[in-house]
Design a protein with these regions (language model features):
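Residue-level signature of outer-membrane beta-barrel architecture
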Residues: 61-63, 111-113, 129, 159-161, ...
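Outer-membrane beta-barrel channels and translocator barrels
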Residues: 25, 66, 114-116, 162-166, ...
Length: 207
C-alpha cells in the first residue's frame, strides 16, 4: 500500500512540475464534471430542515480574455432540497426529505492565479429550471408547490492539473446560494436554496 501511494505522489508531482504554456486570450476550454455534496434551504422561520446529500453533473466552457481572466459557463443537472421537511396532505402530516432536481446555468467571471495560473476563483449569477420535485419518504410529486425558476449566486475555487497539452484534471469546491423564494405560496419568510459540492472532472483545450 505504501509503495502504491508513493508511486501516485511521484506521478502527480511529475504532472504538476511539467512545464506547459499558459492559456492566453482567445483560448477555449470545454469541461465535464461530476460532484457530490450537501444541500439545504435557508429561512428565518423554517422549523424543520437538515442537510440532504446532493449529486450534480455537468458540462462547462471557459473562454479566456487573458491568462488571468476568463468567462466560465456551466450547464448542470443539480440536485437540491433538504431533509426533515414538513409535508401536510388532506389525510395526514409527514416529516420527509424533499428532493428538487434543477437544470442550472451559471455564468461566472473566472480569475486564474498562482505561478502557473493553475488555480482559479469564480463567481457570478445562476438561473435554474426545476425539472422535478418529490417528497422522497412518501414518494409524492410536489413540483406544483415550487416555482419553476430559481435565481442566485454561484461561486467556486479549484485547481487544474495539466495532464497533457490538451487535457487538464479539474478538482474544485463550488457553492450556490439562492436569492428568491422557491415556494409559490408562502405566508412566512422566503425559503431559498443553498448547495455546496466537491467536483472532479476533465477540461479539454480546444484552442
Amino acid at each position: 500500500m505504501k509503495k502504491i501511494l508513493t508511486t501516485l505522489i511521484i506521478i502527480l508531482a511529475a504532472f504538476t512540475t511539467t512545464t506547459f504554456a499558459q492559456q492566453q486570450k482567445g483560448d477555449v476550454e470545454f469541461g465535464i464534471h461530476v460532484g457530490y455534496g450537501g444541500s439545504n434551504v435557508s429561512s428565518s422561520n423554517l422549523v424543520n430542515s437538515s442537510i440532504s446529500s446532493a449529486f450534480n453533473a455537468g458540462i462547462a466552457t471557459d473562454f479566456y480574455f487573458s491568462n488571468r481572466w476568463s468567462l466560465k459557463t456551466k450547464l448542470i443537472f443539480d440536485q437540491k432540497g433538504w431533509g426533515s421537511g414538513f409535508l401536510a396532505t388532506v389525510d395526514d402530516q409527514f416529516i420527509t426529505d424533499f428532493r428538487l432536481n434543477y437544470i442550472t446555468l451559471p455564468v461566472m467571471a473566472n480569475w486564474h492565479f498562482g505561478k502557473k495560473r493553475n488555480w482559479y476563483l469564480n463567481f457570478g449569477p445562476y438561473v435554474g429550471y426545476l425539472a422535478g420535485a418529490k417528497a422522497t419518504d412518501v414518494s409524492t410529486d410536489v413540483k406544483d408547490y415550487f416555482h419553476n425558476t430559481d435565481f442566485g449566486l454561484a461561486a467556486g475555487i479549484g485547481t487544474k492539473i495539466r495532464l497533457s497539452n490538451n487535457l487538464k484534471l479539474l478538482i474544485e469546491y463550488d457553492a450556490q446560494e439562492g436569492f428568491t423564494d422557491i415556494f409559490k405560496e408562502n405566508s412566512g419568510s422566503a425559503v431559498r436554496n443553498s448547495r455546496a459540492s466537491f467536483n472532479v472532472g476533465f477540461n479539454f483545450i480546444l484552442k
